[in-house]
Amino acid sequence: MSKKKGLTTTIRHLLEYATVLLLISTLKFLTAKCIFRIGCLVGIFTYRLATKRKQIARINLDIAFGDSKSDKEKKQIIKSSFIQMAVSALQSLWIAKYPNRVHQLIEEKPAGLDILKKCIERRKGVFFLTAHYGNWEIMGIYHGYQDTCKLHSIIRPLDNPYLNKMAMKFRTVSGNGIFYRNDSLLQIVRAIKNNEAVA
């Protein structure tokens, strides 16, 4: 990488980091309901602008569902996905400085905790096979406050080192752990042997 390109990348990373810090400082004064409403508006706005992403989503839905879903249903799924992504991002920024706010976003006790506790009692560790449904960042933090078992998420580090450091702190704030995807096999084995959970 040339010095000029390296400097450009560093400046871009710093600008991205500064933007996120500004958003956190601004959003922290709002209510959970307000964050949700703004997220919906941002999601709709992004949906209308992101032509290429919509095309990719449509191709994937055509492969997954074929003709079993109508054109209208597929468009609604794509639109809802954009809205959910925007809401999830803003909610994560909203709780960044105040992680206990997660309880305002998940008010009901999650189903299946009894099953998890039975698995932990067997002392063989737990694997979670999860999908990116809903706000998985919030759910991970919420799990850390449930006093069940330590949860390790397998992730790819962010390209921006400043945001990656911030994300690591955010994701581990309630006691969870993080494994990087490319070097996590031995760590996974150790976690399972320690009767912990891996997702």
Where are these regions (language model features)?
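Membrane-anchoring hydrophobic helices of lipid-metabolizing enzymes
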Residues: 2-130, 164-169, 175
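Active-site phosphate/pyrophosphate- and oxyanion-stabilizing loops and adjacent acidic/basic residues
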Residues: 24, 141, 186
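Conserved Motif II region of HX4D acyltransferases
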Residues: 61, 125-129, 188-199
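Short acidic active-site motifs
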Residues: 115, 183-188
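Catalytic core of membrane glycerolipid acyltransferases/transacylases, capturing the structured
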Residues: 122-182
